[in-house]
């Protein structure tokens, strides 16, 4: 997502290949790749299964970590983490301190939700030494090789 995309949380809807924030005021996001594609897929899956759609907290980040730091800070400070049943972390800049603060906040909020690490977030989960706190990693073939090598610091 574009670096100018603000930290935005809440419900989203899918329409014509674009994600729209339920509250409006945010430019629609194309679901062609990345986190918007993951969220679009989750929305379609929930619709098909007839279950409540997820909420999502998104931030623009093109690799310098600014948007990811905002997201980490928001999650670590959020009193609304209690009652969350599952969280999927996807394409966040690998920030060990941010990761660890979020993990501690989740432990304090209890009970621990199901935690899924996908894409780049798997790297920080492994590097932190807390990979066992996660219930599911979803690697592709290259990521799987990295995760299996206990001595590899980065893919």
Segments predicted by a language model, with ranges:
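Small-residue (G/A/S/T)-rich helix-start motifs and N-terminal tracts that mark the onset
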Residues: 1-90, 95-100
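Conserved beta-alpha-beta core of the PfkB/ribokinase-like small-molecule kinase fold
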Residues: 90-155
């Amino acid at each position: 997502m574009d670096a100018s995309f603000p930290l935005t949380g809440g419900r989203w809807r899918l329409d014509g290949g674009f994600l729209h924030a339920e509250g409006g005021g945010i430019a629609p996001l194309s679901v062609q790749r990345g986190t918007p594609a993951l969220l679009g897929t989750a929305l379609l899956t929930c619709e098909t299964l007839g279950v409540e759609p997820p909420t999502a907290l998104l931030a623009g980040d093109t690799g310098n970590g600014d948007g990811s730091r905002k997201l980490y800070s928001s999650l670590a400070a959020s009193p609304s983490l209690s009652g969350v049943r599952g969280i999927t972390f996807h394409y966040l800049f690998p920030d060990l301190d941010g990761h660890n603060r979020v993990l501690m906040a989740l432990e304090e909020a209890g009970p621990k939700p199901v935690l899924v690490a996908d894409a780049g977030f798997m790297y920080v989960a492994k590097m932190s030494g807390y990979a066992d706190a996660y219930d599911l990693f979803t690697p592709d073939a290259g990521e799987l090789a990295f995760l299996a090598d206990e001595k590899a610091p980065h893919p």
